[in-house]
Amino acid sequence: MGPYQDVPMALRPSVSGTDPGVPMASSGADLSAQSAPPPQPAPVSTAAQPPSQTQQPQVSTPSQPSWGQTPGSGESQWDQSPAQLESPWDQAPSQPPSHDQPQNGHPQQQLRQAKSPRILACQLCQGRKIRCNRVFPCDNCKRSNVPCIPSKPAPLRKRRPPHQALQEKLAAVTEKMEQMRREMDAAKASGQGLAIPATPAPTTTSSWDSKGNPRLIQEEGGVRFMDSLLGTMYQELGEIRAMVDTSPDDGSDLILGADTPTFDPMSSWPQPGAVWQLCDIFFQRVNPLMKIIHRPTLERYVAEASSGPFGLRPNIRALFFSIFLMAIVSLDADECAQRLGYHREQALQDFAQGARLTFVRMGFLSTNDLTTLQAFTLYLTSLQGRSNPHATWVLLGTAIRLARKLGLHVDGKRLGLPPLETEMRRRLWWQLVVLDAKTATISGFKSAAVVRDWSTELPRNLEDTDMHPDAKEDFVERDGPTEMIFCLMSYKATDFLLTSGQDFEGVMIAADLPGGQAPGSDDQRHRRTVEQLALELSAFTDRYHLHPANGPVHALAFKFKEFFIKKLCSAKPQPPPTSDQQGFNDVDRAFRLAIIDLEHHELNMLNDDPAFFWFSRVYFQPFNFMYVVSQLCQFQAPSASDKHMETASAKTDLIDRAWRQISFVYRLNPDLFDTSNRLYSQIARKVLEAWQKRSEALLRQTGTRPPAPPYVEKLANILGNNNINSGSLGGTRTDTGTIPTATTLAPTAGTGLAGGNDTSSLMPGPSAGTGPGAASVPTTHALGQGQRPEPPPFMEGVVNYMDPNMAFAGNMWGDDGFGDQFQQPQMPMMDMMEDATTGMMYSGPPYYYPDTEGDGEPSRGMW
């Protein structure tokens, strides 16, 4: 390009002796010929002179070269840029001149009408980044006595038609969908695909497979599993979404709450020494029971994490927050204060907030990252026993969906993944399956939410040090003891319960009860299934040398195996009762199921290792425990003249088992002694009341009063009741502790109970006579004082679903020590509340305590 491409005609120096204001004559030279190098421009005056009449610009034609083109040269010094060819200097007027200006007007008027081209600074001024007056030669070049060469504008890029790329992608996707439609139409025309055959249809050679092709699709942030038909077009669809999608929101705040702009991760991050301690606690107490973290890989980040969170990637930061949270969960309040100097509840709140906000900021719902799912699984485990169990189970469904999105339900070998990733995916998937099964039971469901349609194999018996990240061949499984033993045992037991297809919950409720009939089970089939499981577990333990002497993890796994087999073997179906036999009623069976649930928490105590006590605490449900204690106030030891001695003996055994579990619960959960918590205070009063009745019953039978257990004495001292063994409760309670009967709670006319299922009249509130100042409910029931009544209709849900909240509520309604302390709310059942500890939003009806602040409003309690 020429050095004067953007210089006005009046300011251009003369070239080859020609007058600068006169255009060159057309030479008719070949346009493809090389142009001669331009001579050095002669100095001209910096003062621009008005152009003369002869300096009027001329119109360039194909036979006449434009300005800047040397005679005899076909190539312009402007390089024939499209923008330059379309410059007003080279274009003829597109319309006749107007009447107010003559056609041959003054050139200065034509210059004003034309848009002046942009004049760039010279090359020297651009390189030095100094101001250029854009008059060539410029002042700077003249002072430096160097040639002043104007700069060349950047060439314009060739623009593609608008949305051409999007149209091409849409055309490709449309063509593929058309091809699929034609194949489907052909299949329908041949009679296949219209009806579902009774036998599997023969495979066809069509490229369209109804089962899809499982694959991992690479995308930003990780990989995504897809096995549907649209997976074949995912790449094209993904590029199209990238062109048109402008919404970055993934909805994470809908689950974990909105982001807090003022939150600083450093404010919740522990000190460097505490980071090492928390990680060590996690690997000692949590990791042996939840082998979802590869320890050698994580240890490479510990040193970096000790210096602060900002050098870590968001997924690693979320993982460390969850590890810190689980480490605090595994400690009790005294251990937390002694080892770390933390207040346990405050540490739980800080680390939980750090984990939640990290999840929200990284948009964890839209990420396809295994580390993020590991962190989220640990976070959900930490919520067990600290938040609403129903909300936790709902959140666990989110984790399972994320796992399916990552393809964890398909074995990694089938997907061609490396051995280490394959093994860690197996561990994480089976941990989610076990967690879902446990949480579903606590939430009141008989079966887990996850569907048994996965192909993920059970994890191998391997130590973390056996798995190297760079391994290419499959790992060789160990035959000796490893830390995986407890996880493998729980995976095996859960898989048995999910695949057996039997209602073992119903079997266990009815087992050992006189006249109990195991619902929907066959004696021979049940016996064969349990024997087969016992053989499999025996072979399993023999192969991996399961023995308590191999360490605390093996001791816990050994107790778990014995407990599991014992319960299943004892849960054999019983013959139906005869006409003169009296079996257990629904309340008795619900009471037994609640005791069995508490016996599961006894499991860790059998190991006598405090490091694993947390595993029972996280699944402890205080409302289920309250239900057992409340029932102990109703159960009375049968007399020697009881007609149905077999039933009486079974009930006595249940009472003894319940009191043994109460002792274990107070040993496992020292927080229950904190009577500043209103719920724990009411439980403590109920325990004292139940023990008082048991003590009196044993006194009548044996003539001696049994000594009070240590936890009863401690509760009596805390509550100021020092006469527990003398039969006095300090005058604090005068009610009989009986539950209301159907007669007491009988609805009046028009309530709809007789003709329907409306139980609104059975839900006491401020208007039902249970609030402060309301009339008390009579404690003498229609069946007589001291006689246990049949449960009202609304208690049917306790037996069908064993929802601890329902069982608790059913035994609190009425003046039995809880009815005068709680009021059923006059508000929708799906009231949303925020837990101060976890910050989660969950649903559930709260209870209202009496007005303790004197403001006329009842105090609100958590459900």
From Swiss-Prot:
Pfam families: Fungal_trans (PF04082), Zn_clus (PF00172). Residues 163-190 form a coiled coil. GO terms for cellular component: nucleus. Residues 43-66, 195-205, 764-775 have a biased composition (Low complexity). GO terms for biological process: DNA-templated transcription. InterPro entries: Sec_Metabolite_Reg, Transcription_factor_dom_fun, Zn2-C6_fun-type_DNA-bd_sf, Zn2Cys6_DnaBD. It is found in: Nucleus. This is Transcription factor ads-1. The lineage of its organism: Eukaryota, Fungi, Dikarya, Ascomycota, Pezizomycotina.
